[in-house]
Curated annotation (Swiss-Prot):
It is found in: Plastid, Chloroplast. Belongs to the thioredoxin family. Residues 1-44 form a transit peptide. Residues 62-202 form the Thioredoxin domain. This is Thioredoxin-like 1-3, chloroplastic. Keywords: Chloroplast, Disulfide bond, Electron transport, Plastid, Redox-active center, Transit peptide, Transport. It comes from the Eukaryota. Gene3D superfamilies: Glutaredoxin (3.40.30.10). Pfam families: Thioredoxin (PF00085). GO terms for cellular component: chloroplast. Disulfide bonds join 125-128. Probable thiol-disulfide oxidoreductase that may participate in various redox reactions. The active site is at residues 125, 128.
Length: 273
């Protein structure tokens, strides 16, 4: 009997102690490992055509290595996929995970007049996990609102630059107004989230460019050595800072003396005729 042309498999009792690789001569290791993953319950005469199945010794079933049924190949791939994380489940089309500081900045600026909800969470946060399904349902009912998810464990330095110290935490951004509100929320206080969404989720037209993050937040992100983020303050911001410095600058002694001289001249000047 040509063992290199057939694969022997006992669907009733597969004993690994008596498993012999010589019975699989000519078969690639990948094929052998795939066949070992097949549950005996999945293999029956109903799944194979008579031409494929051949009776062997001791009631074993033989089938050609060149004609492995599609049913078997499909079943071998069932347990290979990666388990989905809880924060990846039930996501809606208007929900997106932030991948970098630059991604957060660009996403906020490209949102235009849309309301953007930034959701700060941690995989180890029980309150975040319990709240996630409700946030997904809210996102489904409000497709015009964009939801950005920021994983605290993956973007710890970013969250610290944005002064995020409580989880779960939410920030709402809209148009030229920038950040319109921010708060912490749990399952017990979900009403706070719904009220903020109702207040800031109404359609409106902003005058001016989309603001996004605040100037001081962008500067803090650029100053953080753990972040790959570059930002140069705008010239308008520099002018405002310069004006603030001029207001609080102390007057020089020369300036004070000049004022005293002018005041004395006014006192001694003759009266007009």
């Amino acid at each position: 009997m040509a063992t290199d042309s057939f694969i022997k498999l006992n669907p009733i009792s597969f004993n690994r102690a008596r498993f012999d690789l010589r019975d699989f001569a000519g078969i690639s290791p990948k094929s052998i490992s795939s066949l070992c993953c097949i549950s005996p319950r999945l293999i029956s005469c109903n799944h194979f055509s008579p031409r494929t199945l051949i009776s062997g010794e001791n009631g074993n079933i033989l089938f050609s290595k060149k004609k492995i049924p599609a049913f078997v190949r499909c079943q071998t791939s069932l347990g290979i996929g990666r388990n989905q994380k809880w924060w990846e489940k039930e996501l809606k089309p208007n929900m997106k995970s932030v991948t970098s500081p630059q991604d957060l900045v660009v996403s906020l600026r490209n949102a235009g007049d849309k309301l953007v909800v930034v959701d700060f969470f941690s995989p180890s946060c029980g309150g975040c996990k319990a709240l996630h399904p409700k946030i997904c349902k809210i996102a489904e009912k409000n497709p015009e609102v964009e939801f950005l998810q920021v994983n605290y464990e993956e973007h710890r330095s970013l969250c610290q630059s944005l002064n995020i110290h409580v989880l779960p935490f939410f920030r709402f951004y809209r148009g030229s107004s920038g950040r319109v509100c921010s708060f912490s929320c749990t399952n017990a206080t979900i009403r706070k989230f719904k009220e903020a969404l109702e207040k800031h989720g109404r359609e409106q037209c902003s005058i001016g460019e989309t603001k996004g993050l605040e100037e001081k937040e962008l500067v803090a992100m650029a100053a953080n050595k753990d972040l790959s983020f570059d930002y140069k303050p705008t010239s308008c911001g520099n002018i405002q800072e310069q004006k603030k410095k001029e207001i609080f600058l102390p007057k020089s002694p020369t300036f004070n003396k000049q004022k005293e001289v002018e005041h004395s001249l006014l006192l001694v000047s003759p009266a007009p005729a």
